[in-house]
């Protein structure tokens, strides 16, 4: 098997080499003479043409056509073709002017004399003014012109014909029902029903609000929650400790200008000179502060603004910089460290005792809830048409202590029968066998009107971060 030979690459033409290597001076020695016509063959033709001329014989290296005039027999002349020249115009005869001829030449030719005795026709159909003139001598009275317009009679012609295809629109409208003498009178159109198809209309917008009238204007839905992108990798985070950021954020970017009254709630734009220094170093090169945003973040109420830096500026005027998130925490949202205990109405270090008494007309009955207090220790009965609820607190021991009473007036409906005085069964006092140290209060709650402590409620695993916008959206 013969060995594999590499394929020979074709060399670039002399014209291509001349275009690339002429400026750099790296051309091969045979390229420049060939392109510029300085080879030995070109020199011999140049020197030989000075002594010998073969132009009339048509000898050359062309296609063999015999030159411009072609091949002709020897001893004859080629035909002569007349070339087109300028068009020949006829000469213009110029009349000579003698010394007796007038210097002013009339442009109009002479015509015959017009006879003015021919009457001029008058057209009176145009409806204008009729002017009558009369010739008079120098001693006669001036002429009187009659300028009153002639009376034109207007003629109106009308033709009436019956068209069976046309129907009066009045007959197409059905009359409204009329009620008279307890009867409902209704009339129907006498025209036959139409032959076209009725297409039902679809309701594109459905409103659940029945108080307002549905119109043709579409009802916009709720706006989707905007993602501000405050906490991204490309946004720098800069906390601001001063409260000036809430009222006058422009004072942190530039120095105070008394004549400037810009919108504190909108987008603030700044123009800085070439060399400047901001009052706050965190606000260096800031050219725009966008609208504020309220949000709840990590248990605090936070005010945020997006700032745009202009760290670089190109020759075309474009500014390049990063985005900065400036935020200030207004107040923390902290949870109480310990539970809040509800205090009773009558404050004392004793147990709860409730006495209710009521009297309707002449009847009265008392209810003693605390069995430790006999009826003799209760308040005397009150003869009044309203309830009196008494709350007294006693200690847990066997001996009742002083009571702190709170009187609350109550009322009962009148349809409840009044019964006799009732007293719950009494039991011997409880004596503890072990010392109580320290002593604590006990509250007995009988009822269902209580509030569950928030710590016993279910907690969500993920707490959402709601956003509250100052003006709905943030300018980009």
UniProtKB/Swiss-Prot annotation:
Q: Which UniProt keywords apply?
A: Capsid protein, Cytoplasmic inwards viral transport, Disulfide bond, DNA-binding, Host endosome, Host Golgi apparatus, Host nucleus, Host-virus interaction, Late protein, Microtubular inwards viral transport, Phosphoprotein, Viral penetration into host nucleus, Virion, Virus entry into host cell
Origin: domain of life: Viruses
Any one GO molecular-function label of the UniProt entry = structural molecule activity
Subcellular localization, as worded in the UniProt entry: Virion; Host nucleus; Host early endosome; Host Golgi apparatus
Q: How is it modified after translation?
A: Highly phosphorylated.
The record's note on quaternary structure and interaction partners says:
Interacts with major capsid protein L1. Interacts with E2; this interaction inhibits E2 transcriptional activity but not the DNA replication function E2. Interacts with host GADD45GIP1. Interacts with host HSPA8; this interaction is required for L2 nuclear translocation. Interacts with host importins KPNB2 and KPNB3. Forms a complex with importin alpha2-beta1 heterodimers via interaction with the importin alpha2 adapter. Interacts with host DYNLT1; this interaction is essential for virus intracellular transport during entry.
| Function of the protein | Minor protein of the capsid that localizes along the inner surface of the virion, within the central cavities beneath the L1 pentamers. Plays a role in capsid stabilization through interaction with the major capsid protein L1. Once the virion enters the host cell, L2 escorts the genomic DNA into the nucleus by promoting escape from the endosomal compartments and traffic through the host Golgi network.
Q: Can you name this protein?
A: Minor capsid protein L2
Recorded source organism is: Human papillomavirus type 32
